[in-house]
Each structure stands twice: as C-alpha cells, then as structure tokens.
Amino acid sequence: MTAPATLTAAQQHAADAVITSLAGPGARLRDDQLTAVSALTAPGARVLVVQATGWGKSAVYWSATAIIRAAGGGPTLIVSPLLSLMRDQVAAAHRGGLSAATLNSSNIGEWSAIEERLRGGDLDVLLVSPERLANPGFGRRVLDALAGNLGLLVIDEAHAVSDWGHDFRPDYRRVADVLRDLNPATPVLATTATANARVTADVAEQLGTQTLVLRGPLARKSLHLNVLDGLSPIQRYAWVAQSLPALPGSGIVYALTVADADRLVDAIRAVHGDDIAVAAYTGQLDADRRHELEDALLHNRVKALVATSALGMGYDKPDLGFVVHVGSPPSPVSYYQQVGRAGRALDDAVVMLLASATDDRIWEYFATATIPDPDKMRDLITALDDADEPQSVVCLLYTSDAADERP
C-alpha cells in the first residue's frame, strides 16, 4: 500500500482544526505524522505506527477522525487498555473539537445514554477496553450496529495483540474478530511504542497483508539517563529527598512497592515539611483520588508523585521534567515505558535509576507469590479425577489440607 503524498484542501483544513485546538495556533502535523494520516484516508487502509512515546500517535487518529467525520464517515472506535488512558483520551478529543465517550466499568450508569448517542450519530469517538470488546453483550448491542458504519478502528498499545509481545492480553485477540466483521472499506490504525521487530511483524500480519508499517527510532534525545547503584535503602531515600528541589519542573518518583512509596513520601516530608509538595500514588487508592493526584501533577500543584507502576502507560504530561526510579523496574520494556513519561515537550528531562542488588529478589517474589504449590495442585486434580460427583470447594480444601498432614 502506498500512502498518498498529501491531503486535499478540505482534509488539511479538518486536520489543522484539530491540531491547532490541541497544540496551539500555527501547529501542524509533521511530515511523518502526515504520512500516516494520509494513508488512513484511503478506503480499507491498514496502518501500523511504531514510534517512541511523545511522537504524537494520538494526533494521527484525532486528525484522521476529523477528516473522516467531515466527509460524512462514521465514528472512530478506539481500543485502549487502561481506564486512566481512556479518560485522558476523552479529554484530549474534546480539546480537539471531537465528541468522545468511553464505556467502562466506572460509568455503567451512562452506558445506555452513550450507546444511544452512538446510534444517533452524535459521537465522533468511542473508547473501549479490550475486555469490553470481548464481552458478548457489548458485541450484540454495539459492535454489530457499528461494523458496517465504522469510520476508523484504532488499536492502541497494539503490542498487546501479539503472542510475542511483552504485555500480551488474550482479550486483545477479540480485535481479530472485529477486523473480520468490519466493512472492508473501514481503515484501521494500530499504534505502539514498544514493539520489537518480531512483534511488529506479527501485529502487521494480523492487520492484513497490505499493512503499511511506519517505524521510527525509539530513542528519545530529550532524555538524559543516569544510573547510581550500590546505595542502601536509606541512602536512596536520602538521595531523593536531597535532590528533589534541584530536579527540573515536576515529575514522578517510582517505587517498587506500596510500602516503599509511603515510606519515601514520609522521608521527603521529614526533610522538607510542607515546602515540597509530594504524594503517594498506588493502586490501593480509589479512582477519584488517583484522578485528583494525576490532575495535581499535570498542573504542577505537586513537585512529584511517588508512585508504583499504577501510574504509567497512558499518563500524558508533556512537560514532565524528571523520572526517578528507586529500584529497578521488572524489565527494560517497563523501564522504557516509564521513563517515556518525561520530556515529551521539553528539550531536556532528567532520568535517574537508583538500582540495587536486592531489586531482583523483589521481582522474583512478585513473579512467584501467586503460583500455587505444585503438591497441593496435584492433590486437588487427583481428588477431582477420583470423584464420582461434583465436589464443593470445602471438600477440595479439606482434601488438600489432609494431604499436607500425611507423613
């Protein structure tokens, strides 16, 4: 598939209206973004964009949506993996002059009204999670109605589609069913920042044999990566507390555990009191509190959020000045995703990793803590296999406990 070199005057006007609303007067699509948008104006286009965080992948699908809607096309369906990411995308779409909504577990009471708006043509963009996409009821109510009238399908974080991906999610496989049932003229865009060559090839193959792959360098020139290892836990806390005032702007300090995040916040407050505003951000907070803290960081009301991995993919603050890791992330891909929060709209941002030999033991614990005991599992399977009738959970647990007591 060869991408058209330019947009028509009407298409360019629609794209410019979105970009200037999002990025200010005079903002325009870059040539590499324009290539992707131009390709998506062709009926049946299949485009895979593999670009670094901060490249502006969302600008591509907002612009393409505006062009398609201006030409009388149907709405855009975006498959997105995180509630926080969907919330930010809805807000961005509104800033770009597009009507958008999401169907997720936090707004069940709004589903009927949103689906009615969708059927009435009042929505430009609908965002759903892969889990919602895999729900049979959602398929009957929404997908069947949309399949013949969808203007654009966007698969965000598309590496999760691939069996070879670092973050494979089985529910993303439902995308293949959606693709099969789509009107063949519906364009499809898949985006990711963390796909190696094998994952890229796998995702492209699932999209179709004529997929246009637009892959750029994943290095971020604005990020200055530093590593300081060999510090004890107390020394790492001290480094953060002492260095925080000198770090540029506001940012994120990543901790490996909830307890570490809470202790580090206490350590910073012990040194600076109320002079440096910080807060802990973990998965144990309710959605409203997490949203409140995300907004506080976005508008620089805090110097830093001390966060677990609960704050990661999908959080978009273009002027985030630094990311500090107190402990090594579980993988290079996780590290790349987390440091990618910084410096999106800055020439320079600071990234610091405070590594320790004990970090590997923490991740080994996380990886094995939920694995059941092999002997107990064998006993349970044997009990099920030997039973002549259905067994209650209580009976099965008794069987397992009795086996533990055997000499």
Roles of regions detected by a PLM:
Residues 63-90, 96:
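Conserved SF1/SF2 helicase motif Ia
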Residues 41-42, 47-48, 52-55, 66, ...:
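Helicase motor core with emphasis on the C-terminal RecA-like subdomain
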Residues 7-48:
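Conserved pre-motif I regulatory segment
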Residues 372-390:
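Short amphipathic alpha-helical interface segments
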Residues 389-397:
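Short acidic, hydrophobic short linear motifs in intrinsically disordered regions
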Residues 398-407:
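Single conserved hydrophobic/aromatic residue that forms the stacking wall/gate
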Residues 60:
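Hydrophobic positions on the alpha1 helix immediately C-terminal to the Walker A/P-loop
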